[in-house]
Amino acid sequence: MIQQESRLKVADNTGAKELLTIRVLGGSGRRYASIGDTIVATVKDALPGAGVKKGDIVKAVVVRTTKERRRPDGFYIRFDENAAVLIKDGGDPRGTRIFGPVGRELRDKKFMRIISLAPEVL
């Protein structure tokens, strides 16, 4: 469950290392984001010379959360960290690589490019 002011690690090679959530997209009163949801965030920590700088406002999709999520088959999925991947306005990832596993819920939300780049889909 990601909400305003939540900090997330970045799971791609755009150069950003940490994000701070500004807003959860998808409705005026939407409070929480889970795997596959889109957020607006600001870059809090970035590598020097990277494509994004500290203070940039970016869109990102959540790929891992520490809060467990119930799947339709009854299983629960939970990760060790909160992580996101930076995306363009069209929904394609800004980076060319994705690090670590991502949730299967991304397939339902039509983020197929992220699924294809990820090393593991859980």
UniProtKB/Swiss-Prot annotation:
Presence of keyword Ligase: no
Annotated Pfam families: Ribosomal_L14
Signal peptide: none
Example of a GO MF term: large ribosomal subunit rRNA binding
This protein's record includes keyword Cell wall biogenesis/degradation: no
Family annotation (CDD domains): Ribosomal_uL14 (cd00337)
Keywords for this protein: Ribonucleoprotein, Ribosomal protein, RNA-binding, rRNA-binding
Annotated GO CC locations: cytosolic large ribosomal subunit
Role noted for this protein: Binds to 23S rRNA. Forms part of two intersubunit bridges in the 70S ribosome.
PANTHER family named among the record's database cross-references: 50S/60S RIBOSOMAL PROTEIN L14/L23, LARGE RIBOSOMAL SUBUNIT PROTEIN UL14M
Family: Belongs to the universal ribosomal protein uL14 family.
Subunit structure: Part of the 50S ribosomal subunit. Forms a cluster with proteins L3 and L19. In the 70S ribosome, L14 and L19 interact and together make contacts with the 16S rRNA in bridges B5 and B8.
Protein name per UniProt: Large ribosomal subunit protein uL14
Organism: Thermobifida fusca (strain YX)
